[in-house]
Structure formats: structure tokens, C-alpha cells
Swiss-Prot record:
Example GO BP: proteolysis
Residue ranges of every copy of the MPN domain listed in the record: 102-224
Region forming the signal peptide: none
Name used for this protein in its record: UPF0758 protein Shewmr4_3597
Residues reported to bind Zn(2+): H173, H175, D186
Motif (JAMM motif): 173-186
Family the UniProt entry places it in: Belongs to the UPF0758 family.
GO MF terms held by the record: metal ion binding; metallopeptidase activity
Length: 225
């Protein structure tokens, strides 16, 4: 049944305006973005099928264009709408972890890194630069590709830290497999970076590995002394 034929106030847009966005299901929220469906499939049904196809909202919003646009009812325009929504969410997270903010809440850092790095189809190694009071200076993506001990260069990390006058850092990278468990290579990289940063009296506070649903902290495991 077309949404226009639903009882008054039951359509996702009307429900959002009356009750607020928090009262909508994932499919209903997505339907508001999609605006319309296709023949025999209303926007909510289309949204539900997309979520099922990709296994969740996050995977859908992180999927490449060719994977999304190959599905019936989703062309470049709808893909652009979805990407705009995803980018807005990332920018909200960026504002939540803005320059000058003191990192006193580990959950805030985890949420930010999850939004930035989870579900990337490639590995990203990044660094969160902090001042002596552990206030945020900048978040920088340093390396992309296969992250191993040969592809992460401590001298580049040290150079950036000196340039930004950071006093402490948190490094992080994602596992495209979705499994956050650190590898032996991750532990070797961490040790090399810690030793390199120690030569300029900068503290490595943590190395966080981002998976699909969790983040593993080296500091919490006692791997950074």
C-alpha cells in the first residue's frame, strides 16, 4: 500500500513531525530520506529491504556507490541523500570532539572513533593529537591501505606531533574485517611508536583498534606502560 493511503498521521514523515524522530523505526527514518519507493514497494518497504540487504544501517551508509545503486529503486540521487545523512552524522561527532575539549570521557572518544573508522572497506591509521592538559588539538588520518609494521612510519608520526606541538597522542586504526582484536603486528607498531615518541617526551596514551561493533583499547589491556 502506498504511504499516501495510510491512515492520517501514520506515515513516517507525519509521525516524525508529531511524535519526534526518536519514535520512528530505522526503516521509517530511512524512508523519510528516500522520500519514495518504486512500483509495488513504498518507501518504508524499500528502506526495510535495503537494511536487510546490507545487514544494518551502518553497513548501508558505508557501502560504495556501485553496491547501493545496483539495487532496484536506488539511483544516484537516493545514494547522494544517504551519503549526505552519513556525513552529517560524522560532522556531529566531530563537533562533539572539538578542538580544545578535554578528553575526560573515554566513551566520547570511542563513539567518535567508531563513527570515523568503523565499516571502512580499507584500513586507516589515524592519530588524535592532544596538548599537555589532554585537550584535543586535531584528528589526522595518516596512512591508508594495509596497516603493518612496514607501512606505518614513526618518523612521520613524530614529525606531525612536533609540527602541531602535541604533548600526548592516541593512535587508532580500523580492521575492515570488523574484528577488533589486535594482531601481533599491531602490538609491534605500538611499541615502535611509543619508543619513537618517548625520544621527544611525548606520551602515547592509547592505541585503539576499531571493529564493526567494538573498540579494543591497548591501555585498558595494560599493553601500554
Amino acid at each position: 500500500m502506498a504511504i499516501k493511503d495510510w491512515p492520517e498521521g501514520e506515515g513516517p514523515r507525519d509521525k516524525l513531525l508529531v511524535k519526534g524522530a526518536a519514535h520512528l523505526s530505522d526503516a521509517e527514518l530511512l524512508a523519510v530520506l528516500l522520500r519514495n519507493g518504486l512500483s509495488g514497494l513504498n518507501a518504508v518497504d524499500l528502506a526495510r529491504s535495503l537494511i536487510q540487504e546490507f545487514g544494518g544501517l551502518r553497513s548501508l551508509l558505508c557501502a560504495p556507490k556501485h553496491q547501493v545503486c545496483r539495487l532496484p529503486g536506488v539511483g544516484p540521487v537516493k545514494y547522494a541523500q544517504l551519503q549526505a545523512a552519513a556525513e552529517l552524522a560524522r560532522r556531529v561527532a566531530q563537533e562533539n570532539l572539538q578542538r580544545g575539549q578535554v578528553l575526560t570521557n573515554p566513551d566520547l572518544t570511542r563513539d567518535y572513533l567508531m563513527r570515523q573508522l568503523a565499516d571502512r572497506s580499507y584500513e586507516v591509521f589515524a592519530i588524535l593529537l592532544l596538548d599537555s592538559q589532554h585537550r584535543v588539538i586535531q584528528f589526522v588520518e595518516l596512512f591508508r591501505g594495509t596497516i603493518d609494521s612496514a607501512s606505518v612510519y614513526p618518523r612521520e608520526v613524530v614529525s606531525l606531533v612536533l609540527e602541531k606541538k602535541a604533548a600526548a597522542v592516541i593512535v587508532c586504526h580500523n580492521h575492515p574485517s570488523g574484528i577488533a582484536e589486535p594482531s601481533q603486528a599491531d602490538r609491534r607498531i605500538t611499541e615502535r611508536l611509543k619508543n619513537a615518541l618517548a625520544t621527544i617526551d611525548v606520551s602515547l596514551l592509547d592505541h585503539m583498534v576499531v571493529g564493526d561493533r567494538e573498540i579494543v583499547s591497548f591501555a585498558e589491556r595494560g599493553w601500554i606502560n
